Amino acid sequence: MKYDYLIVGSGLYGATFAYMARQSGKTCLVLDKRPHLGGNLYCEEIEGINVHKYGAHIFHTSNKEVWNFVNSIVEFNRYTNSPVANYKGKLYNLPFNMNTFYQMWGVTTPEQAYAKIEEQKAEMAASLAGRGPQNLEEQALLLVGRDIYEKLIKGYTEKQWGRACADLPAFIIRRLPVRMVFDNNYFNDTYQGIPIGGYNKLIDGLLDGVETKTGTDFFREREYWEGLSDKIVFTGKIDEFYGYRFGKLEYRTVRFEEELINTPNFQGNAVVNYTEREVPYTRIIEHKHFEMFGQKVYDCPKTVISKEYSTEWKDGMEPYYPVNDERNVSLYAKYKELADRENRVVFGGRLAEYKYYDMAPIIEKVLEYWK
């Protein structure tokens, strides 16, 4: 065999696997059907700004081994994710914390905020008269009450899923963290940041010295590619790997409307969520804020924004999020059963495992494999 590993997909799972294989003295060939490497982490430089072409990616972890690993490839900056929600022209800090409650009700102490939330939760509990929540709407109202739900959850969630909250299963929202402190840091993790110079630096570092082929569809000449190696690492759609034998898994996808604007600072923050149903996009990303902090944003006279629209996935579109309803979960279980019987194929990543992944757990999983 020509290679120890054939790796299908050069996203974070594939690239990290290739790096670890090479460190262990193994040979790899990495294929990607896109014209570039990096999967959804790919960035394009526009006017000196690294634009996240497939949506905002913010690295965060409490795992020191993973943090040291990525920083050994490329240095990360101090970016802290602190999104803002825009509801009908009023701004609210996220995640839900004392700043949010002050903006919503004018409360200034944790005791006042707690009382307000408990009062609204009790109203919902009373209306359910002892039965459990039947859908996402009831679940959210039980967790945080009507004001937070109506202004910051309902419209955003309905846009994300393309259906009413009353028609979505309750399990989608198991908990909604409420912080009784003035803290806009979205993540609880010890470490977070963005690679200095963008995510391409991370991917290029992981794939340094590895043979790669872009613009190459594994399924077009499957037998040829499979013949090059004893072991295959597959990071694409698991249902496609098995020829959709049991039917197609469903996804949500995201459409991006990118705009280069002749102003140095469009919204003053990397991420602004638009939480009312009537605004068609879910959020606007202003990319320069991921790597330029404070007044430094004015050193670059232009800015790039991306409006994100969540839509139903159809063939030919990029699959983003798995739809974890009963039908898809049981369908995936059938494919997983086939995958578990494979000796020569490793399935890894969000498409091959049909699950939503943050970046750090993907790296953890690969490091674990090589231990």
Identify the function of each model-found stretch.
Residues 3-30, 370:
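N-terminal Rossmann-like FAD-binding beta1-loop-alpha1 element of flavoenzymes
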Residues 12-13, 35-37, 99, 158, ...:
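Short, solvent-exposed loop/turn segments at secondary-structure junctions
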Residues 22-47:
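Glycine-rich FAD pyrophosphate-binding loop
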Residues 24, 219-338:
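Mid-domain catalytic core of redox enzymes
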Residues 47-123:
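Dinucleotide-binding Rossmann-like beta1-alpha1 core, especially the glycine-rich loop
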Residues 77, 211-215, 346:
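General small-molecule cofactor/ligand-binding pocket signal
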Residues 90-92, 99-230, 235:
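Active-site/ligand-binding neighborhood in enzyme catalytic cores
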Residues 318-371:
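C-terminal catalytic lobe of FAD-dependent flavoproteins
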